[in-house]
């Protein structure tokens, strides 16, 4: 046992000796090696050191007489004394705890000349390389950390110190002298030690004395020290010139005055209460001016911050009030980019590509870690702000101004159970917008009402012209309510477009007086939409067909590329499995519309116009089997066309009564001549019946049951020569269904010929047959009729006409008669259209 104890004692003695040797010898030696060799080599200057010591038993480290020379000037750096007294609590708390830090006689004399500038760039370059190599480690550290690191530093003292910076090229000469700073502690730990040091701060800035008064409260329930810091109209612009990122052509702080009245509270841990380091007070900036290439991009006459409390230990912040008054932003976009982005890049220290990439990669890690900071903004406001946007990449340049912008936030916080309120108003696009509501940051939730009046698209017309290749002008108004919870959104309200015009050059493509949308609700979570009203008043559409296509195709084609790219993106599994949207429209209407069509691709040019278009649809929805009502009317060819009935979407179904009255063919003669080579001097079309749509075996079947008639017809060829005419042709009891095979029945077909001689009658009938023949490319039918010697009656009547088995038939009509020949011709034409046999013949029943 004695030997064991002796061995243990010897081992302990050796360990103590090694520890003492490491402390007394190794630490000073390592310090000298780093400063006198490594730092000297990096800076290209001989670093000297008078003395350095470390007591391993008291953990006191002292460095004396550190000097870094500067050619032709005072030393770059001199430090008379650095004393650091570490606490043994560092080992138990696994975080640095420093009992005392004393800095005496620190003098930094930075002179920026060409040589020093190159040295700085070289050192920064090495620093950038080091940052890249340590990127993975930094990312892991970012993931692990969730707030401020744990540390505590007590009894801080800085005396007899100064800092000067001179750059003759930039005309900078700043000096901070006679610096004295005493702080009881700076800590993010609840408790570690106590300090009764009275806080103090005093220095001269360019000869102007600045002081902060301190006090100590050593008795009572708390041991507390305070430091009150006051400054009035400090020229921040002069100080900002020292920072290269804030003193370049892209970004320069031209003017700013800082005033502060801040109180630092250092509360020692007593009576079981944790240590606190608190900051409160007011700070303001006045006459802020930020320029880019000598032009102001940001001006801020006044900014005020009233900080209720900032607790670095509990990591809690309460802002009583933040006010920005008279903010002006001049944002410009040119071929070189957006000026504010260039300024932001300059403020960030450059535009190196590696840095954004590193930030992009680290972003997910940062977002994945929840910050422990809690905060609250009791009130914040933006008053009388103006933002101007000029985009010179367009011709003409786009100019948009947000004027008289007022915004306020109240009781916004990190508390997930409490929502704050906000309001915003501004003059925009020639009108005014207003919004107010409640907001919650985490998780994101917003409930707001927004209203816009007398807004105009004129200011954004250059963007619309670039996107569509056409000019759009319109007025806008809206009054909506919206709720946002995470990725789900719901909205309701009204929106109106008025005095809308769409022009290409001097030609108006479309216009309308008013378009209104009244939305009861749309909910992305429920995937439902309930529309109360969609209305379009006095729309006019001017469609023009040319050899290069219809005029509207250019507008559709302008977004084809982006549309194709969008369609090419595969839908996610969630989207594919999501239920279909349900929707309903209480009423949709078009009133007093006009459709004008002009075809310049044919000769002669053909035109047509459909005026007095009116359409009303009610109670249309996606519900299976539901039917809404439809009511349509329009002028057509000097007459009218009306339709009314029921219509459904799922499945497609319709039962609509149709009536066409006195619809003239002459207004469409130009188009008829251009498309078919046949025009019309006269002709009136009438129709009365019922149209139906029904779904059968995933196919939509269309049907018609009613009467058709064509009166006072006079057809001509392209040269104006008459082809045929009749008093009246009618189909009574016409039934058609697009089944397979097609169902077609005519109870009675009549053609009332003009009162003429037999030869003339034969020619008229031959003309009818010739018309059919010319449309199908065959002429023998006309020859057969011309050879027919039987007297042709003035009126041709066919009863019970049917189309069955690929051929037409009628009661009492022989194949050799004029009626039979016409039916045979129609059978051939119908068979060719339906892809059937062309050898069909008529039969007599």
Region locations from a protein language model:
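Amphipathic hydrophobic-ligand
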Residues: 42-46, 72-86, 170-182, 204-213, ...
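A short linear hydrophobic-aromatic micro-motif
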Residues: 47-51
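Elongated, acidic membrane-bridging lipid-handling scaffolds
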Residues: 130-246, 359-459, 464, 568-667, ...
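Flexible, surface-exposed loop regions and adjacent strand-edge segments
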Residues: 115-122, 245, 299-300, 337-342, ...
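N-terminal type II signal-anchor transmembrane helix
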Residues: 1-43, 222-227, 457, 798, ...
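Flexible beta-edge/linker motif
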Residues: 53-117, 141-166, 195-200, 263-282, ...
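Surface-exposed loop/turn segments flanking beta-strands in extracellular/periplasmic regions
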Residues: 121-131, 342-354, 553-565, 772-775
